[in-house]
Amino acid sequence: SLFSLLNKVIHINNLESGIIRLMITRGDSNKTSPVFNMPCIYISIKPFYSIPIKPVKVVYLDETNYPIIRFTPAIKSMNYIGNMLSKRDCEKQGGYEPVFYNKDKIITECAIRNIFFIKDKVLYTPALELGILSGVMRETVLNIAESIDIEIKETYIYYDDINSMDEAFISSTGIGLLACYWDNWESKHHYTNLIKKELFKRIKNS
């Protein structure tokens, strides 16, 4: 069973805590036939890496410079080449995570994470119709914000407007929530820290 396979991988790698990824494809197929063989199963595992305590730097990049395809509705693709190339370029500029904007200069998402902004106690995050993934952590953050009376707006956020924001943070299952900053902009992250505190409380009690 899948559970026995996952447990075997955990046991072989001797990890008490970490991140495990399960991927199941439709199997091999030749180019001329719509018929697929037995599904292929891929399992990868890695230990939790050190998560920064202080706010991390993000770098805004034009996603049209990378081989990134957005689908509507979004899918979890296994092609990360564009994301990894952008991570490399981000790190060259001293950044932790790249944040993309599209051809219309609308913010979409990070290379492997979601981006959120706060202004006047309103939480802004890019709309799903832009072709971004609605991950587990993204939905959790929205739920937490709502529970502590922070208004939510899933909308178009223009690159030219980011410096007017009060706060910003990124999120993913692997890191939880990280406050962020960028060149010539920083924040005290008041509401960000409230959301993060509630997130840790939920994780601890789960």
Residue ranges and their predicted role:
Residues L2-H11, T25, T32-S206:
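Helix-start/capping segments and mature chain N-termini
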Residues H11-G18:
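Short secondary-structure junctions
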